């Protein structure tokens, strides 16, 4: 069931990104891309739509190595779920850290969950709180609301000292534009 939900999330997020592209107007020579948004026909996303997770992982990998934030995030999801690749939380953690460091809210939220559950890393409520807070700052709308709820739920299991430490680390992380978030 988790794999089916993850597949749906991957496909829907890809479709939403593709639909968010506005048509170019004016002189195309003066248009500066703000971010690399995949076109609906790009191979890794088409592979996901077909349910070819192994093929998608193979296509995402070189892009992720070159720094493509969405490829890093999607590869992290595939490794965390074991879809198309052997499940490997350490590798998922690696890709989510890279994407989170580039400001990807989804990857930041995945890091929070991995720290909260101890997946690929020692369970750490302080770091989970930090990444939930950072992801909340990077998100908008309903996803922001859900992330903040998760953070607040985590806070109920923490001491005041842990929360104070987490808030200090969150501030440091945000002020450094995700460069000093206590990650290795």
Each predicted region: which residue ranges?
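Terminal, low-structured helical/coil segments at or just beyond the last alpha-helical repeat
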Residues: 24-31, 37, 143-184
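Hydrophobic face of amphipathic alpha-helices that form TPR/SEL1-like repeat modules
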Residues: 40-47, 59-63, 74-81, 85, ...
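Bacterial N-terminal signal peptides
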Residues: 7-16
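N-terminal leader/linker segments that initiate helical-solenoid repeat arrays
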Residues: 17-54, 58
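Short coil/turn and helix-start
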Residues: 49-50, 65-66, 70, 79-87, ...
């Amino acid at each position: 069931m988790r794999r089916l939900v993850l597949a749906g999330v991957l496909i829907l997020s890809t479709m939403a990104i593709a639909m968010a592209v506005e048509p170019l107007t004016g002189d195309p020579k003066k248009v500066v891309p703000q971010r690399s948004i995949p076109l609906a026909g790009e191979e890794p996303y088409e592979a996901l739509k077909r349910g070819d997770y192994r093929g998608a992982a193979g296509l995402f990998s070189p892009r992720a190595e070159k720094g493509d934030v969405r490829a890093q995030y999607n590869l992290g999801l595939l490794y965390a779920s074991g879809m198309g690749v052997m499940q490997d939380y350490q590798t998922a953690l690696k890709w989510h850290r890279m994407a989170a460091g580039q400001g990807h809210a989804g990857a930041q939220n995945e890091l929070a969950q991995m720290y909260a559950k101890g997946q690929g890393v020692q369970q750490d409520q302080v770091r989970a709180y930090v990444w939930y807070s950072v992801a909340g700052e990077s998100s908008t709308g309903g996803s922001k609301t859900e992330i903040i709820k998760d953070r607040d739920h985590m806070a109920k299991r923490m001491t005041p000292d842990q929360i104070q430490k987490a808030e200090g680390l969150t501030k440091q992380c945000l002020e450094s534009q995700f460069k000093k978030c206590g990650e290795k």
